[in-house]
Amino acid sequence: FVQHASDMEPCGEEEVRRFLEKLYQDTGGDNWRFQENWCTDKPLSEWGSSVKYEDGKLSLILGENNLHGKIDLSGCTALVSLRCAKNSLTEIDVSGCPLLEELDCTNCGISGLDVSGCYSLRRLLCGYNSLTELGLSSCPYLTELNVPYNGLGTLDISSCMALTDLNCAENRLEKLDMAGREGLRMLFCYGNRLSVLDLSKCSSLTLVNCGANELTRLDLSGCEKLGRLYCYDNRLETLDLSDFAPLLSELYCYGNRLTELDLSGTDRLSQLECSYNNLQRLDLTGCKSLRIAGCARNALRSISLFGCEMLGQLDCSGNLLENIDISACPYLTELICTDNLILSEIPESFDRLTLFEHDIRYEYSVEKDAVTGQEKIVYMDRGKGWWYSGEPDKGYHGR
């Protein structure tokens, strides 16, 4: 296809001029923000900064230019780049543009986009529109596809085996066939209706965000380069990190149904958010790079922080913990551990914390003595929580 496209003779300057004059008329050119020398007799090279025409190849930069209506450049064989983001368009037709390599029509409001016959297309940015379908069968060399926040119910990328970056987030997709795409590096498919996602043997993947779907199965086997994984708000009961544990730096798996989480070998993990699951224990032993950890709202009875020497923030609220040992975390400055079963005196080592949210064992109030009329401090023992040395006799919660 590329050979065929490169051999095709691009249309001449006069034909290009006719395409541009029609574009001007179709999209309300008189109201454009930038229209310098458009539709004049001057050479196309003098039609302002929005037109670049050299060696028979045409590039258009029309972003945020107050275009309205439909862009029809179908059959413009000289077109190599079209940037028209942030306009008020209804439809874009660039079919039969075999030299077109880049199209950016982000946030234009279009409901129709025709890229058939765009055999050279490598970069397609069409997010934040109203597309319900998108045909890509004639785009075999597409490497970057950005189509988030549309209304797509299906997305057939079977012909686009060169993809390295795919963003199809916030659509209505129920299926996405991605297995075996060894060149894929980044995938954003959050906010869809996926129940299964097979990314096995996607050996170049470094980032996956598949959050806010309906996933019950996520296959990441063979994803040996994966460093950032966001699979939050799904229905996962298991999560296997073994194939990429040594490179994993960020894991956000909150809002699932996980009962266990094996983090062994995750030496580079710096951010962990696994709140709102069904975890009963969490072993962070050896997570020497961990800086932020959130494990709130689980069923944790124990948490091991041995070796977490870089940990700075920990939220373990809403669990069943009876104690917590932070002695191995010299850089911890923020600890949230409310709503647990902890019954403990606050050690002096906790005084370094800049944020310490905890259950307070003793509640103090002031009452008047019924006989003398003098005020006195009384307390109620909640039976759980933290207290400082000297409480409750000293009558206040503090060092």
Q: What does each model-identified segment do?
A:
Residues 1-81, 98, 119, 140, ...:
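N-terminal capping/linker segments that flank leucine-rich repeat
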Residues 77-80, 90, 101, 111, ...:
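Threonine-centered tandem repeat motifs in low-complexity domains
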Residues 395-399:
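Extracytoplasmic Gram-positive cell-surface binding/anchoring modules and repeats
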Residues 294-296, 301, 305-348:
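Ankyrin-repeat and related helical/solenoid repeat scaffolds used for protein-protein interactions
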Residues 76-79, 97-100, 118-121, 139-142, ...:
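Leucine-rich repeat
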Residues 65, 87, 108, 129, ...:
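Consensus "Asn ladder" position of solenoid repeat domains
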Residues 70-71, 92, 113, 134, ...:
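Canonical leucine-rich repeat
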Residues 58-62, 82-84, 101-105, 122-126, ...:
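Conserved hydrophobic beta-strand positions in leucine-rich repeat
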